[in-house]
């Protein structure tokens, strides 16, 4: 759980306040100047898409800021944990407004005190929903490595990488699949006792 980590834009505030439903509503209100609006994120996404009247740029910025703050928190998490990032929930309908800033954060740079530039995340970050990036992710940087003392070679892939994707299952299905897999693992564990 990264929810109690500090927020990039508001260091004394928890990150959840920058990535939750209330954040999208708050940022839209602040940027549009309509702080008393009654829009929900679905409405704000429709405004961004031009399907509903409202401030299009404020709507896009609300989702872009969510992506930036989420990307910052995810960059910290993937530094500590090796795994894929799967984003789910209703908010994913606004993917095209969230992902550019989220990926920018994950692919961002940092500097040492002497000015040396480093990647924010040690791994190469791939958008697995992008067909070309998925192919690159799957291919990696495989090369032949000679096994010392033999004539044999093994495949070696030195590329550290991480993938980011939007869940295709939806929250309810993902929970069901996870519960089913857990139940099967528990049954298998009982059989082995």
Which residues are covered by each model-predicted region?
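Short, small-residue-biased leader/transition segments that mark boundaries at the very start
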Residues: 2-4
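ATP-binding/phosphotransfer module of carbohydrate and carboxylate kinases, centering on a glycine-rich
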Residues: 8-193
């Amino acid at each position: 759980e990264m929810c109690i980590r500090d927020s990039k834009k508001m260091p004394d505030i928890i990150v959840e306040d920058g990535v939750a439903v209330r954040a999208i509503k708050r940022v839209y209100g602040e940027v549009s100047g309509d702080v008393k609006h009654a829009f929900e994120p679905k409405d704000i996404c429709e405004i961004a898409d031009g399907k509903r009247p409202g401030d299009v740029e404020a709507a896009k910025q609300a989702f872009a800021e969510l992506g930036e703050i989420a990307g910052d928190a995810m960059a910290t998490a993937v530094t500590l944990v090796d795994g894929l990032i799967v984003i789910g929930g209703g908010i994913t309908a606004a993917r095209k407004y969230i992902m550019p800033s989220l990926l920018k954060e994950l692919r961002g740079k940092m500097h040492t005190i002497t000015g040396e530039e480093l990647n924010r995340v040690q791994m190469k970050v791939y958008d697995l929903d992008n067909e070309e990036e998925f192919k690159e992710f799957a291919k990696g940087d495989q090369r032949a490595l000679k096994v010392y003392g033999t004539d044999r070679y093994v495949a070696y892939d030195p590329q550290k990488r991480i993938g980011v994707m939007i869940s295709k299952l939806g929250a309810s299905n993902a929970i069901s699949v996870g519960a089913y897999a857990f139940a099967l693992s528990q049954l298998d564990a009982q059989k082995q006792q």
